[in-house]
From Swiss-Prot:
Its EC number is 2.8.1.-. GO terms for molecular function: 4 iron, 4 sulfur cluster binding; ATP binding; magnesium ion binding; sulfurtransferase activity; tRNA binding. SUPFAM superfamilies: Adenine nucleotide alpha hydrolases-like (SSF52402). It comes from Neisseria meningitidis serogroup B (strain ATCC BAA-335 / MC58). Present in outer membrane vesicle formulations which are used as vaccines in human. The thiolation reaction likely consists of two steps: a first activation step by ATP to form an adenylated intermediate of the target base of tRNA, and a second nucleophilic substitution step of the sulfur (S) atom supplied by the hydrosulfide attached to the Fe-S cluster. This is tRNA-cytidine(32) 2-sulfurtransferase.
Length: 319
């Protein structure tokens, strides 16, 4: 096999893997429904470009109809290349809206010099995007957070916030008017990096505001990347844990009635299981290779009727 042919094969596997990961997340959490109008938040980074690209692929083949509109918030950061996103979106024929709001000056005026601006900037941006979604008549807001973002948020909240809380794949917006979805919830960041290189997206740098990166998030990110390198399968195991929560073996009295626990009561997940050695597979699969010797993680899900976004459009007469 030639080097070129091998690379093409790898590229096809990557595209298929991403498409199926996004499709699985959409199916598992019922993210997209018939006639949805989805506002895809496009920052100019690799994640949001990939999100839009994969949703367009699914839109072309899915058995349901839904609309996509790309929205970028131009926050008037110094050096922001205003022409990049409109040029790209027009070239691929995607409806879009550029919202111009000078949040950069607001943040700089409110915060002291040298302080991390990300938190305040994020709150301002969220409010503007909610307003824009309402103006456009969108039923869903799609964000580009991926699996690594979700795990990083879990550890940030555990280490620095004292909460067992991550980033939900689907939620109701703060104002209660919109459903926010994260179709990249099952996607690995390293796959998104490869995909951006493959597709040659016109990436816009994320540090134009000059803000220092969040040190805590950087530490967590480095930790996860180190674990992924040294302990294959650990990241997959941790993400699986988010989908297999056992409240009776934690310590939150709001989630489980410890006070009302009585003798003879049968627990769904067993009572003393935490004291026994758990049977764990020697190796977890991350889904990147088709290897029958690996044990793939399949979280238990309740049966429910949802539309399979990965299915094909129904054939029409004469097709």
């Amino acid at each position: 096999m030639s080097k070129k042919t091998k690379q093409e094969l790898e590229n096809n596997k990557l595209s298929k893997r991403l498409r199926h990961a996004v499709g699985d997340a959409i199916n598992d959490f019922n993210m997209i429904e018939p006639d949805d109008k989805i506002m895809v938040c496009l920052s100019g980074g690799k994640d949001s470009y990939a999100l839009l690209d994969i949703l367009r692929q699914l839109q072309a083949s899915a058995p349901i109809d839904f609309q996509l509109v790309a929205v970028n918030l131009d926050q008037k950061q110094p050096g922001f290349p205003e022409e990049v996103l409109p040029t790209y979106l027009e070239s691929i024929g995607v409806p879009y809206k550029i919202v111009e709001e000078d949040t950069y000056s607001t943040v700089k005026r409110v915060l002291d010099e040298g302080k991390t601006t990300c938190s305040l900037c994020s709150r301002l941006r969220r409010g503007i995007l909610y307003r824009t979604a309402k103006e456009l008549g969108c039923t869903k807001i799609a964000l580009g957070h991926h699996r690594d973002d979700i795990l990083a948020t879990l550890f940030l909240n555990m280490f620095y916030g004292g909460k067992l809380k991550a980033m939900p794949p689907k939620l109701v917006s703060d104002n209660g008017e919109h459903i926010v979805i994260r179709p990249l919830a099952y996607v690995k960041e390293k796959d998104l990096i490869k995909y951006a290189e493959l597709k040659q997206f016109p990436i816009i740098p994320c540090n134009l505001c000059g803000s220092q990166p969040n040190l805590q998030r950087q530490v967590i990110g480095d930790m996860l990347r180190d674990w992924d390198k040294r302990f294959p399968g650990r990241i997959e195991s941790m993400f699986s844990a988010l989908q297999n929560v056992v409240p009776s073996h934690l310590a939150d009295t709001e989630l489980f009635d410890f006070v009302g626990l009585e003798r003879g009561q049968s627990l769904k997940h067993g009572g003393d299981l935490a004291f026994d050695s758990e049977k764990m597979p020697e190796r977890f699969s991350d889904g990147s290779e088709e290897d029958e010797s690996e044990i793939k993680i399949e979280p238990q899900k309740a049966e429910r009727k949802v539309i399979n976004i990965l299915a094909n459009k129904p054939k029409t007469c004469g097709s």
